[in-house]
């Protein structure tokens, strides 16, 4: 990037994210009118894509001489990523075989992930920290992709704005058939996350409601958290 600037002292703030090739200046996943208040696009809200990855840079009091200068900057990621994986595909297949009129093929299921409480929605490039949150955010995954030999299936995933410390969000994961009937619901699923790390949460998302004797689950979540550095 090349800038024409007069001699003096400057503050440099940068934000980079993905844009559509046919309209590169339009905001796609983040509103970037102000770098002190970068906010996620919530209408519509989009998840299940790595195109939400982004990076920023902030440095104050940069002295620029009359002859100019060349700077190399190291961008930082203000995000953490997580994914939800159902580990009970084989148990669900058994339910399909026993009651095919109730339990449709995996490709006919819809998964909805609802963030419980507030979800980080804003980021201040000048401080390197989230600065806003909203409630009522959710996303859906329609038609699960898997092979007949798979024992696990990816239900969904998202990126979360973070600072330099660990934090968490709680979600409700609801699985429905193509008629909207609820087959399983797991609430209070805690997702721990950390900047530039991937958190993978495994659980009985497809059959947990059956094994617990009902559809709704509102107990302590016993999932497994794997973090890759």
Language model features with spans:
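Structural motif
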Residues: 85-97
